[in-house]
């Protein structure tokens, strides 16, 4: 019985610390934390004989490159869908 009480007290203390941290967050931090980053390129399989994997633009899937960094720098960013 004593160990279960100790466990509950520990869980309660950890919950209070987490709640305290959430209250201390600024509005700017909360707005920034709910954004999802979608990279401009995705990995795909290519029809090339020597190289099976390539990286294609999400906005223009017909544009594909062998190097992911090159693809990320040359692809236009994806436009978010807003309803």
UniProtKB/Swiss-Prot annotation:
Keyword Signal tagged: yes
Expression sites (tissue/organ): Expressed exclusively in ovule embryo sacs and in early developing endosperms.
GO BP, sorted A to Z: embryonic axis specification; suspensor development
Pfam families: ESF1
Signal peptide: 1-22
Keyword tags: Developmental protein, Disulfide bond, Signal
Phenotype when the gene is knocked out: No visible phenotype, due to redundancy with ESF1.2 and ESF1.3. Simultaneous down-regulation of all 3 genes by RNAi induces embryo abnormalities.
Disulfide bond sites: 41-56, 46-75, 54-71, 57-64
Highest taxon, organism lineage: Eukaryota
Keyword Protein transport: no
Similarity annotation: Belongs to the MEG family.
Protein purpose: Maternally-contributed central cell peptide regulating suspensor development and correct auxin distribution in early developing embryos.
Protein's name according to its UniProt entry: EMBRYO SURROUNDING FACTOR 1.1
Protein's organism: Arabidopsis thaliana
Gene assigned in the entry: ESF1.1
């Amino acid at each position: 019985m004593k160990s279960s009480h100790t466990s509950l007290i520990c869980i309660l203390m950890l919950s209070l610390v987490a709640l305290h941290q959430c209250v201390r967050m600024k509005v700017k931090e909360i707005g920034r934390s709910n954004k999802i980053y979608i990279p401009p390129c995705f990995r795909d399989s290519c029809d090339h004989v020597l190289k099976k994997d390539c990286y294609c633009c999400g906005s223009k899937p017909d544009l594909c490159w062998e190097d992911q960094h090159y693809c990320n720098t040359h692809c236009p960013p994806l436009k978010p869908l807003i309803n």
